């Protein structure tokens, strides 16, 4: 066992804190590098290995950047509002505020034990009034700009959590928090108009250095569709409805239309003889989530309304059906069905024996979903693709029955929550004045402590008289506060703006400072946030820009998703499975640097993998070996009279590995390829060991230069251990104030190389040659090799092919 332990961790953590080593320099913003990991939610009592996998390697990357000369800003905080703390309180009786702050205290201690260079003086905690005051300010600014509004709407309702869920929080028809089946409910809710920014949210994506999969997920979620809106009149009625389609060229093939069960027209056009069946179907559909209804694997169902619509392009009557696979929240809540050219429509038509009429040429069988020439389409026969679409739209426009239209899958962001542990919405309701904003000077609207928050489907704050009853700021009369709280994603949608200016009591942030500090240069967190937090933060940034507070378009220039650390059994860690990995025990046994290095070497950072106790022990042995080698090197330097100053073969060999390591590690760590970086360090370690173990006289000054570079390269990955080794070689300043080494291209040019010699295509020997050797000299060396002579024997040499510095192939018969 070596000397490295948690005592060394504690020693250097204390020194770093005493010397304010990582304090951000606000006077040097030209070289600023804003590095941010998604902050932790303090729902559990402690950080687990997954948190470390997010924070530890990113800290190593930030240290590397600091040594490259960047002024690194790396803050930390806690996303502290939300359902888990409230559910825990209901279960245990411990108040959310008490459990949250206790957990934060524990996690702060753990994060400091990691040795990360977080700027703790910039910490934010979203459940603190000095933070959510400005979350409320943000809501009011959005409200003033018409980007926040309240309306009655069908919402996702979790009967277990007793609260509304955003579409993004429903996974396969179940609540992402408690896995309960999600219902539908009509409630007055607050929304943010993210749809106003749909186009820009799409357009700017391609400019970002983000994973392609994440950009694709956001594009799909926004779901821009370019098509046409077509008007269908209801037969024998003055009713009409519009449908959106991207394939208006198939309009002649419409054989039925389908309305969502929630569509307001359903009751009006359902005939008396079909009413009972339609009502029963509506009730059934109400219990299905939007995601379930849209599932491609689920069999489509529907009922006939009894009414017919008129196809505007050919005047044919088509039946109007009610189907739950149509969503009232998407498009117009009505779709035209072309079973010959749409798989879903084809399956529905086949099931209910509805007509199927080909109107696009192509394919041996139906449905044919590709583009082709229009057929059975009257005057439009023979037209193809965009020309066909334009011609049909032009005809519809001339009849005032259609127009070009762009549609989006994206819905406005529902932010109301009927729960306690969240930021109160700063709105007051007065019988005389109506809806009134809480004046800025009265913020924050503080969350009261003594509240009965057992879930009953109603907002807990509505049951707290001291909170709910207030005075109207306009007329001074009696009024009521908004009882709902804000979705916790509102709190996290802007936290990156607060970090650099977290003690500002007058404003959410100082625009002059923030516009120099932002955007975030490197953002790291899980891919599960692609269509929620990451999208919301982009929206809020653009909204604040348009209000004049920000001069940039995007919050996060570069994004990396870390992988998932699984339990030793290869399954996702969970307390119920008993496969969680607590960092504390391993740090106590091995030290923080061994734990950190294992996470970086044992896994591809963007993929993760299963935990292995054997693998972390191997890293512990590697650190012990490095310690012994560096101790031997120090002794060699100390005892040497430095009577050798030449760079002979052994020195050149080590120097090659040294500079190859500098080059490779610099490139790999920059791309967060930590595992290959540490592999290069291991190669450098082997080269040092070989040099120290050789029998020849050693160059002490060269050896010192080599171990200085080695420790410098090691520093981001093992910060405490590297500082200790740095001190032991007699350097008093912190290694993290050192400049990152640069490789010498000349050192990568070898005097000698080993090449293979083949006889008739099979390798028979390897020889060392000078890189400056001529082709004839290489041939001579190969032919004079004893193994080659034996291999050729009595055969006649027909040809000798030389690929310089790589290969010799001898053809002999």
UniProtKB/Swiss-Prot annotation:
Chain positions of motif 'HIGH' region: 40-51
Root EC class: ligase
Location (main, coarse): cytoplasm
Catalytic activity of the protein: tRNA(Leu) + L-leucine + ATP = L-leucyl-tRNA(Leu) + AMP + diphosphate
HAMAP family: Leu_tRNA_synth_B
Cellular compartments per GO CC: cytosol
GO molecular function: aminoacyl-tRNA deacylase activity; ATP binding; leucine-tRNA ligase activity
Localization terms from the record: Cytoplasm
Family: Belongs to the class-I aminoacyl-tRNA synthetase family.
Entry's EC annotation: 6.1.1.4
UniProt cross-references to Gene3D superfamilies, sorted A to Z: 3.10.20.590, HUPs, Isoleucyl-tRNA Synthetase, Domain 1
Record-linked SUPFAM superfamilies: Anticodon-binding domain of a subclass of class I aminoacyl-tRNA synthetases, Nucleotidylyl transferase, ValRS/IleRS/LeuRS editing domain
Name this polypeptide is given: Leucine--tRNA ligase
GO biological process: leucyl-tRNA aminoacylation
Pfam families: Anticodon_1, tRNA-synt_1, tRNA-synt_1_2, tRNA-synt_1g
Keywords assigned by UniProt, alphabetized: Aminoacyl-tRNA synthetase, ATP-binding, Cytoplasm, Ligase, Nucleotide-binding, Protein biosynthesis
Entry keyword annotation includes Protein transport: no
